[in-house]
């Protein structure tokens, strides 16, 4: 019962924040870039929560189940990408743009802008679709596999999609940013609390080593030697390139209250990503030593929340996992929405129509 209660309270709180911020939306700039009002700390929270999506809590955690301590190498690409972004953030904010296609259009013309809008729409709507699927899979796993609910996977996916769309529509980046901060704080707190509990239950490093040995996975205690150099490149290069071109990050730069704020937030983001990714992988690594069912590979943290943690801590971890997926999904939904609004306004300007930014 406590799992239902905590998750329900969490989702209701998200909706309340969305409704409370919706009255602040007066024009497209408010909706798309939060009126360019976000402080460095709010920016750090929203960028971290956006980057830490299903790839972290399901992908990296699931891979860590397979390769063990070598999983700590998986986030390196994203970390290096954030360092590179520290050189870009200030220039992006100084451009005073709303979207990445707008930047491309100002440099290469309208055709390039339209092509970039099409590319973003195609890519990001695909990403949103599998965030819906991931959200549905998590809800299904929580309520069907662990709580015995009759909820089907399709129903769970529809619930996830409806919630994500409704929440994004409420107040755009303004609501997304502030709930992302709450998600970020919840993530750090939850995974820090869970880490020593799981470590103690696993019997420390000695118990983990014995467990991995009994499962025929002794290399899971080794950081190096499991992945070849080519494997490391294969796992890290895509995330490095993704974060460099991630329109979500640029939208946050545009939303910063100043150039210096954007630069400071991106610098702090590096440390936030290092801490959060390491906590997720550490929790998954320790938990994997206690799980014998290979079918739980991609849901290792969900399984751990139910089976290895006290109910209240486990319920908060489940709410955190759902929140991570929601943060990523609504961000990837907001980007194409903003691009379409900008393109539509640009077309109206070409026709001599001036809405004064009131299309929202």
Where would I find each of the regions flagged by the language model?
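Helix-loop-helix module between adjacent transmembrane segments
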Residues: 49, 72-171, 238-239, 323-330
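Loop-to-helix junctions at membrane interfaces in multi-pass transport proteins
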Residues: 33-38, 42, 59-69, 105, ...
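Conserved small/polar residues in nucleotide/adenosyl-binding loops
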Residues: 342-348
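Membrane-interface alpha-helices at helix entry/exit sites of multi-pass transporters
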Residues: 110-119, 260-268, 344
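Extracellular loop-to-transmembrane helix junctions
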Residues: 2-21, 34, 62-102, 187, ...
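Membrane-interface "cap" regions at the ends of multi-pass membrane proteins
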Residues: 1-57, 168-171, 184, 190-196
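Residue-level recognition of pore/gate-forming positions within transmembrane alpha-helices
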Residues: 11, 50-51, 78-82, 120-121, ...
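Juxtamembrane interface elements at the cytosolic ends of transmembrane helices
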Residues: 16-27, 85-101, 166, 172, ...
